[in-house]
Amino acid sequence: MNAFVASVAPIAVAGSATLSSAVCAQKKAFFGAQVAAKKTTFEAAPARFIVRAEEEEAAPAEKVEKKAAAPKPFSVPTLNLNAPTPIFGGSTGGLLRKAEVEEFYSITWTGKSETVFELPTGGAAIMRAGENLLRLARKEQCIALGAQLKDKFKITDYKIYRVYPSGEVQFLHPKDGVFPEKVNPGRVAVGSNKRRIGQNPDPAKLKFKGQETFDSDLKL
């Protein structure tokens, strides 16, 4: 029995030695050969110094007050009775009989191109490229046509005149050169009353006086 153990022991030792050498060989194959570590050195970059000359502070500029340009004084335009009329094959309905006794109305505008537009009296016409003149019986017809020119064709230079039988011409719209819906400095309000409706006087106090509550200067 002892002889058997003695004979086996060297085999086991030899086997362990061969196993350890094989494992080391595998480790070397897996991890690679040993590499000697090198010392890392850090070199600081040379410092840069930028020299800048101090700029002299500019003296504060004097504030120049911008004055609003004074509006140009409005001059009443003159009516050119020889301006061409729009092209249409029908009639505007003619002028009323009062045109021979009282007045008729004219509207002028500058067309951008020959474009078809609707007449306030019915039907359609072709406005000319350039100056146009149309005679109508009522001021309301001119205002309606002016609204169409402004909204649909973006024409804002239309003007309305009243022409009397004597040949006298009265400029009506826009009265001061600016349309009523726009603010015009210096415009005087017409028919305005700086008070609320609740501050109007009692109608009983104005009875038989020929005054209206909104026109009276009486206070509550």
UniProtKB/Swiss-Prot annotation:
Any Gene Ontology CC annotation: cyanelle thylakoid membrane
Record-stated family: Belongs to the PsaD family.
Protein name per its UniProtKB record: Photosystem I reaction center subunit II, cyanelle
Topological type in the membrane: Peripheral membrane protein
Domain of life: Eukaryota
InterPro entries with a match to the protein in the record: PsaD, PsaD_sf
Chain spans, region Disordered: 192-220
Gene (UniProt): psaD
Known function: PsaD can form complexes with ferredoxin and ferredoxin-oxidoreductase in photosystem I (PS I) reaction center. PSAD may encode the ferredoxin-docking protein.
Database matches in SUPFAM superfamilies: Photosystem I subunit PsaD
Entry's localization field: Plastid, Cyanelle thylakoid membrane
Ranges of compositional bias, category Basic and acidic residues: 209-220
Record bears the keyword Thylakoid: yes
GO BP annotations, alphabetical order: photosynthesis
Signal peptide: none
